[in-house]
Amino acid sequence: MPITEQEALLRCIDHREIFHDEMLHLFRKIMSGEMSPVMIAALTMGLRVKKESIGEIAAAAQVMREFSTKVPLTDTTNLLDIVGTGGDGANTFNISTASMFVAASAGARIAKHGGRSVSSSSGSADVLESLGANINLKPELVAESIAQTGIGFMFAPNHHAAMKHAAPVRKELGVRTIFNILGPLTNPAGAPNILMGVFHPDLVGIQVRVLQRLGAQHAIVVWGRDNMDEVSLGAATMVGELVNGEIREYEIHPEDFGLQMIASRNLKVANSVESKAKIFEALDNVDSPARDIVALNAGTALYAAGVASSIADGLAKARAAIASGAARAKLEQFVQVTQALGKA
């Protein structure tokens, strides 16, 4: 007999794990609309209070992947997602979005999965729209965007229709639940490589192990000690790295790469217009904290994608792409191609 919803709640109350097959059953009920809003709220809050285990998160992510609308890609060589869980409260500009243009111009292929703002003043979808890109492409056109530009953006609501059953509950609860950490684990293009920023240090070890269970190829999970869900310039960054099935955990410092430490307040923005200005500052090679943090994150992404042999090698490639104008040109190309595909 499959686990009942009440049994699952009792497990949470007793701080006992819900096993893999049981989580698959429960989350399939959520995604197919068979669980009531009251039970969705109770289960997700119960898991939060108990603290979700690696196995529980992996099973829930597996179900979200099952129910997602996929981007049809046959070749995933050097394909990478650059994504954050959000919720770090740092209100910085869209560092991962800017990094995506740099990484793509240096040889990575990007399948970025994102939505509107969670914690920042503007989410990746908000800022890409303000840059002029079309974020609402159909899955086959996202694949075409990757083929033409090396970048595809997958607007999360377009790929996770089954989440409509949980969305009102999440909104009304207004607190973090397991869903906040599932989004970055459910790339609809099946990107085997990922650079993921997380909002809490405990999630570094958890998410890298979840990605291991989900079969990721090269994953780098980061949390900056100044509470940033990026590779930070303002403090040390905790890293969980999965490569060839093995996990390493370590710290990196800006000084390791000859970079000056700069407080994250220098990267704060109030809205997507300010975020856009910082992105241009970085991509136009203006000597600034914005350029340096984008280069460092893009360099880490190039390493995760298998285009660079190390973060330091990736940083050198990222700097060269910015200095040559290739990164800014990639942004312009992406905007033009997504607009054209949207009219096709």
Curated annotation (Swiss-Prot):
Keywords: Amino-acid biosynthesis, Aromatic amino acid biosynthesis, Glycosyltransferase, Magnesium, Metal-binding, Transferase, Tryptophan biosynthesis
Binding-site residues, 5-phospho-alpha-D-ribose 1-diphosphate: 84, 87-88, 92, 94-97, 112-120, 124
Residues annotated as binding anthranilate 2: R170
Sequence positions that bind Mg(2+) 1: S96, E230
Pfam families listed in its UniProt record: Glycos_trans_3N, Glycos_transf_3
Presence of keyword Isomerase: no
GO biological process: L-tryptophan biosynthetic process
Subunit structure as annotated in this protein's UniProt entry: Homodimer.
UniProt family annotation: Belongs to the anthranilate phosphoribosyltransferase family.
Name of the featured protein: Anthranilate phosphoribosyltransferase
Organism (species): Janthinobacterium sp. (strain Marseille) (Minibacterium massiliensis)
